């Protein structure tokens, strides 16, 4: 099997720019051809998950997120079904609130089966 594509995927967004407008860091940059480029240097999701620095750039707004950022995803019409299906319930929210004050051992144990375990404890504390 080869990685060949005969027809490029069409931009199904049309004139919708909800994601561009929702991004707190304006990281979706317009290109001359009408497409957009995600400038990860501005993206809160990149910084809260992948950036291992002790501090985050001052210009990056986290908009209440300590892990990732879903502002663009939450407004996308393509994601409406997924967004309503995977919303946090009160139990999930309570567990995350408890982690805010957790020590490192508790954090590691509580997140071992979660996507949240991708970040180090120091990043978790930095991002709050």
Question: What are these model-predicted stretches?
Answer:
Residues 1-7, 37-57, 104-108:
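Short, charged low-complexity linear segments at domain edges
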Residues 6-11, 24-25, 32-33, 55:
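A short secondary-structure junction signal
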Residues 7, 60-63, 115-119:
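Short, solvent-exposed segments of well-ordered alpha helices
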Residues 93-104, 109-114:
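Alpha-helical adaptor scaffolds
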């Amino acid at each position: 099997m080869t990685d060949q594509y005969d027809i490029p995927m069409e931009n199904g967004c049309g004139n919708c720019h909800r994601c561009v407008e929702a991004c707190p860091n304006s990281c979706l940059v317009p290109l001359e051809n009408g497409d957009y480029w995600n400038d990860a240097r501005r993206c809160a999701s990149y910084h809260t998950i992948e950036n291992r620095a002790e501090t985050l750039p001052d210009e990056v707004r986290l908009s209440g997120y300590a892990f990732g950022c879903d502002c663009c995803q939450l407004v996308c019409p393509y994601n409406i079904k997924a967004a309503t299906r995977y919303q946090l319930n009160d139990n999930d929210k309570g567990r995350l609130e408890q982690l805010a004050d957790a020590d490192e051992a508790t954090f590691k144990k509580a997140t071992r089966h979660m996507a949240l375990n991708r970040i180090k404890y120091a990043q978790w504390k930095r991002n709050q």
